[in-house]
Amino acid sequence: MTAIRYEFIKTCKQTGARLGRVHTPHGSFDTPTFMPVGTLATVKTMSPEELKAMDSGIILSNTYHLWLRPGHEIVREAGGLHKFMNWDRAILTDSGGFQVFSLSDFRRIEEEGVHFRNHLNGDKLFLSPEKAMEIQNALGSDIMMAFDECPPFPATFEYMKKSVERTSRWAERCLKAHERPQDQGLFGIVQGGEFEELRRQSAKDLVSMDFPGYAVGGLSVGEPKDIMNRVLEFTTPLLPDNKPRYLMGVGSPDSLIDGAIRGIDMFDCVLPTRIARNGTCMTSEGRLVVKNAKFARDFGPLDPNCDCYTCKNYSRAYIRHLMKCDETFGIRLTSYHNLHFLLNLMEQVRQAIREDRLGDFREEFFEQYGFNKPNAKNF
């Protein structure tokens, strides 16, 4: 019996998007879904109870950061990540690969793994497929990610080809090193940049290894959205229908809808909490920067169409005041609202799939949100 099981429910006749449910050792969640990111075993400024109140069934935490602080052995001694952070629903941990490639100024890639420097103090560190599995096994997440190479965008075909081949070899080593397959599901990560031939090769390699789920990596790294959508169109059909599909690092509302239309089940991104910290809010009418002077005497909610805790209790003027005074409560209120907005958006997406009208929903949402304008402001 595998730790992770995907239950297919239905396909949207209008778009081909899929409705499903992922079953884990810590409960089930409906898909397509958005996963709030709790990098250091906390979703910034949010309590587990608040995340449950907005119906989050799974959150993401970060292997690299927890390895450095507090250390995976301390988390193991605490009884695993769920007990350590008092979260009894599903947790996904990434492999640390993205952080190694994005945070460290110095890195050297070898067949064995990656040498790099700790971004906190400059110490030399080494991360390999085996080490990534050791850390994630200690953390005890429900879904673990294979250690992959995260190439930059753009990259040449030759570079990407070598990178894909190495990622496939590393994936095999991850499977061999994974010590808890009965209670932790390990996902493989399809790479290949914007090259269809390499995506095909990567998917073929990984599907042959029979992972319980698959991620599409190497997107949302600076490429235009039309390239991301095109890559998804030729990549997701290569993945098994009976396994969950996860698009890494994507969290803008338009990309969540477009990803679901292209067969993706799971998304994660720091975007909603990151932009909340500077006062940028997602609303049903588009992007709103609550710090702006025009909201100083606006006593209405952030979003008149939202029923979250923030919108039911606090005004734009009050939240603006908190943000201008650097009060943490302001960040809590905007973070709560943005996370609720995306989780509620995914429920609307699921409902549209149930009703076979996700294409219509997309048009309505894009029109109302302002994504159809010539110079649409994104995040």
Swiss-Prot record:
One of its GO terms (molecular function) is metal ion binding. Transmembrane segments: none annotated. The keyword Metal-binding applies. Keywords: Glycosyltransferase, Metal-binding, Queuosine biosynthesis, Transferase, tRNA processing, Zinc. This is Queuine tRNA-ribosyltransferase. Binds 1 zinc ion per subunit. Pathway: tRNA modification; tRNA-queuosine biosynthesis. Residues 249-255, 273-277 are annotated as: RNA binding. The keyword tRNA processing applies. The lineage of its organism: Bacteria, Bacillati, Bacillota, Bacilli, Bacillales. Its EC number is 2.4.2.29. GO terms for biological process: queuosine biosynthetic process; tRNA wobble guanine modification; tRNA-guanine transglycosylation. Substrate binds at D94, S95, G96, G97, F98, D148, Q191, G218. It comes from Bacillus cereus (strain Q1). The active site is at D94, D268. One of its GO terms (cellular component) is cytosol.
